[in-house]
């Protein structure tokens, strides 16, 4: 799971943050975990940050490290909770590009987001919730072009 406020351990380097779960579960040796951390950092375009600490990174870089950390345990499903909401607008795209690449590779992603253009672009199914309840569910085409509830119609008129 990836959260909006990164949840990186400040006393660990970028690599150590990524290696922690695979090492604690005896999933990988230290050497294999280091190799995997480097591969994952390359995947999110941050290999040069391997030995840096979270406070040396931008918000977008921290979020990409959080993505790499989540991928370190080889999940079948990636859960993303408002992963761009704490970022400056110029950093949002770098995180969304990583998520888009994962979706294209076939990763199942469940994402809570207000990034409607992004949701429309990469989603197979969109769920619109209002006041804690599901109001509409369907293809991006259906929900964005033919919203049936007043709540979704109102929401889309404000954000699109």
Question: In which residue ranges do the predicted regions lie?
Answer:
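ABC family nucleotide-binding domain
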Residues: 1-140
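C-terminal boundary and immediately downstream tail of ABC-type ATPase nucleotide-binding domains
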Residues: 128-131, 137, 141-160
């Amino acid at each position: 799971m990836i959260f909006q406020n990164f949840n990186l351990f400040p006393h660990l380097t970028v690599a150590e943050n990524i290696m922690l779960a695979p090492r604690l579960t005896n999933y990988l040796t230290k050497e294999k975990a280091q190799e995997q951390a480097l591969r994952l950092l390359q995947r999110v375009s941050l290999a040069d940050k391997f030995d840096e600490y979270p406070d040396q990174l931008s918000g977008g870089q921290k979020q990409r490290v959080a993505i790499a950390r989540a991928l370190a345990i080889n999940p079948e499903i990636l859960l993303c909770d408002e992963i761009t909401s704490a970022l400056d607008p110029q950093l949002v795209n770098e995180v969304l590009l990583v998520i888009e690449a994962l979706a294209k590779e076939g990763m199942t992603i469940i994402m809570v987001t207000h990034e409607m253009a992004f949701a429309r672009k990469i989603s197979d199914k969109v769920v619109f919730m209002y006041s804690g309840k599901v109001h509409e569910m369907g293809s991006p085409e259906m929900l964005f072009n033919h919203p049936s509830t007043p709540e979704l119609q109102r929401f889309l008129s404000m954000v699109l």
